[in-house]
Amino acid sequence: MMTSNECQWDKMYKNRSIDGKLNVCGSKIASLRKMVRPRMSQRMLADRLQLAGLDLDKNAISKIEAGQRFVTDIELNAFARLFGVSVDELLGFPET
C-alpha cells in the first residue's frame, strides 16, 4: 500500500523538462545537424546513425529534435560520436 507521501510524489513527478519537452538535447541535435555542410537532412542523419548501428528513422529524429520523444543513453552517445561533441554538450552542460 502506498503512503500519502508516495501518492503526492507520483502526482508531482513528471518526466519532462521545464518547458514540457521529453528531452533536453533535441534542439542541440537539430542545431548541430543544420550546421553540417552540405546541410544534413533528418533522413541523412538517420541513415548515418543506422550505419553506426543505431536503428532510428527520420520520424524518430524529427520527434527527438522537437522534444516529443525520449532519448536513451545509447542514442545520446551515438549522436555525440557522430557530431564529434561530448554528451555534456548535447545535454547543455558547460564545457570544463
Regions found by a protein language model. Name each.
Residues 2-38:
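A short, Lys/Arg-rich alpha-helix, primarily the initiator
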Residues 25, 36-38, 54, 69-72:
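Flexible coil/turn residues that form the inter-helical turn or adjacent wing/linker of helix-turn-helix
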Residues 27, 43, 58-59, 73-76:
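Short alpha-helical elements of helix-turn-helix
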